[in-house]
């Protein structure tokens, strides 16, 4: 039979996009990648993963797969203070994290949502200055990170009300407002310079080596200012944004920038060919996070997929959380000051193991032995095939037994549970399947499969 593939957009009819070309001008659409393979989902996912790695900017973060602690999710939730940060930094260092990212709230003493935009430390939160916190992180061997939403200014930001309208996305002579924010228009070179100065200042003043760049808004169908069509203003904004990032990395090649947008938005390789890490969710429930962990490597390379790990209850809860992140990029958070000794040790074990296998995660390709999981799935499974070994995460959110089909089962030399190290479950290979008996529902284990 025949296979027909149609790619379209942006168009005027569907997207309100058009661009007028003068004689001699040309226009090239954004690139799109498609995998054409023999086989099904897994060969296609492998091919797309290799393609994404090939088009991506070479960077040390995606070579090292740094472990990041972020103080937001199920942790401080945007309410930082010096006292809180210092104690959490100590815990992050003890766990074996390599970066510490101070998330939202560091720039305002009160309700900060609609006042973002100047990116200056809040003296009420940090009486001795933000540098005290950054210096403490550095003293513990951690590289320091800060949260930014660099493309917006809140409607209550004093600076925003002093700036001309052409700094912002506008329609019908007024600034577009979404979620109490104005959107900066990166087509304006003054905007790009201002934002670059912010980044350079934070790097120079605080020793920041990591930015989590969020985007909790949408500019809708674009701007009618200085553009053929509103939608083309969106395209031009993103082209300028990408160029802005490329210029930053030319001057700061070791800087790490995480791509975030209310969790996992803007997860495209226009952004991810430049930025090394992608936030995949703002999901606060670790059980639902497993559904994301089991599927997300279809859309992002495993080493770029930041997955929240935020344990705060019993041992199986800790294990489930850690397994969520083990074959992606574990992104540590949670109320770590409440963890007992056993839970801390279980977390340390997971992070230490991740450091042992992360080069194989970096070089391997994802596979989905049960296909894509759904919210109703009783069993979830996701794996990474590396050159020598295969790693497989298995979750049982609604059952205690899992049956996972294995490719080339007759060639398997050994299967073992590598997290947790005590195993604490039953398993065997039977009729070409890995059969797992968990100690309870809502359990997870990480397996290593070695071939003959």
Language model segments and positions:
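Short secondary-structure boundary/capping segments
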Residues: 116-118, 162-163, 227-228, 272-279
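Conserved, mostly hydrophobic/aromatic
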Residues: 24, 137, 195, 214, ...
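Active-site and adjacent substrate-binding regions of carbohydrate-active enzymes
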Residues: 104, 108, 122, 190-269, ...
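Aromatic-lined carbohydrate-binding/catalytic grooves of carbohydrate-active enzymes
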Residues: 64-197, 210, 220-222
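Active-site-proximal substrate-binding groove within the catalytic cores of carbohydrate-active enzymes
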Residues: 241-427, 433-448
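Generic structural signal for hydrophobic
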Residues: 88, 92, 137, 202-203, ...
